[in-house]
Amino acid sequence: MTHSTKIVTCFLTNGEKILLLKRSDKVKSMRELWAGISGIIEKDELPIARAKIEIFEEVGLDDEQIRLVKKAEKMRIVSPQYKNHEWEVFPFLFETKNPEIKLNWENSEYNWIKVEDISNYDTVPSLKKVLLNLL
């Protein structure tokens, strides 16, 4: 039987650039891989609510500094790290006018990149696929 975990994955845009975060060596999974802003959805929590919480926690931008541009259909992604596990990903695209990011312990670096440059980064599984569903 496959176990599934519901998560949000958010991308922030600033002008023509997309924010990528490098996961720190202190997180449980996908250490030192580049990712969007993500987090596990708690019980009956709405995905959009979790998305905004994660954006504030991971990059320090509050509701006033972000605007929802698009949400995509839920995606199922098989986890290469765990047997019989999949991620149910709820993708969101937000924009911000503020490129100043305040990282918490979950991430060690950030880069504002052009969409086409995502292939140059060692990312969490299917990150490009999730991003392209939002564009």
Across the structure, where does each feature detected by a protein language model lie?
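Functional cleft and adjacent loop/helix regions within the main domain
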Residues: 34-37, 43, 79-84, 93, ...
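A short coil-to-beta-strand element that immediately follows conserved catalytic motifs
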Residues: 62-72
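NUDIX/MutT-family hydrolases
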Residues: 91-93, 102-131
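Conserved N-terminal beta-strand and adjoining loop/helix that marks the start
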Residues: 1-19, 37-40, 93
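Conserved Nudix-box catalytic region and its N-terminal flanking loop in Nudix hydrolases
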Residues: 17-57
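Active-site-adjacent beta-strand/loop module that shapes the phosphate/pyrophosphate-binding cleft
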Residues: 5, 14-16, 72-100, 111
